Amino acid sequence: MVFPLPDKYIDLLTDFGFKRVFGTEPNKALLIDFLNTLLPPHHHLKDVTFKNPEFLGNTLVDRRAIFDIYCQSETGERFIVEMQKAKQNLFSLGARSLGRETRPGSHRKDRSVYYSTFPIQEQAEQGFWNYELTAVYTVGVLDFVFDDHKHDSELLHVVELKNQHCEVFYDKLKFIYVELPKFTKSLDELESHFDKWLFLFKHLAQLNEPPLPLQDDVFAQLFDVAEIANFSSREQALYQDSLKVYRDMYNVTQTLIDETLEQGIEQGIKQGIEQGRAEGRQEEKQQIAKQMKAAGLRAQDIAQYTGLSIDEIDGL
């Protein structure tokens, strides 16, 4: 059943909102405009072609990869674009608070590097091939801050391969991350087109009408696409489901972060940090899964975010 929503516009941080605005053919001008605020001038986009976002491994045992958005420019560059949420960064925080060795943010960075290998492999040609590649960009809009960036005010990070002299070794593989929580400008403080996009990522759902600083043509299209009243009944239902998952996951994550930090401090004082490693991690996942079930999330969603199997989740 679809219930009326108080918001006029969708939340771009939901899975439905992000893919509707940036991942559909009629709205690709919005994706192009946003990406061009991040890309170097020589790779600015005029057009993109959306590609299948699902990649299967080369063998039955290989993991598959499913991107939020995968597209290719008219000159061959490939772009993975993802909305990356804090909930998917949760386990590295829990492990550290219990004293287990882990590199800050390594889980998320490892995943980005792993994903980038698929567009590279896709370019291989049968028969004779000179190994010439077109550029691959992985763009992550982050709803969290990397742990090793918490004391850094810079919110835009462009990463590429460099040698020991900080000289670019290879310029066809780039990772671009935008840490949204660090963006705190008000409407009156917006200076650049990039600022305007970040403001909309964070505040679109709170607006009742397009404000004066956001009257550009591209944003007029965005406000039209994002207006919930323009959705079909099915689209409204899909958005409400997506919004519920986003809000439930956010609440569960915040609760678990608070509990994990409190437990870590208490355990560190009373016992030292000597917890069982594999067993402790499994118990963490099960506890998270239980809270997700209590919040009404589907087993498939819980499996995606915890790594537990459907059978394990059903047995909790």
Question: Which role does the model predict for each range below?
Answer:
Residues M1-L98, R103-Q236:
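Conserved single-residue anchors adjacent to enzymatic active/cofactor-binding motifs
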Residues V2-D7, F79-Q84, D195-L316:
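Short, charged alpha-helical interaction segments and adjacent helix-coil junctions
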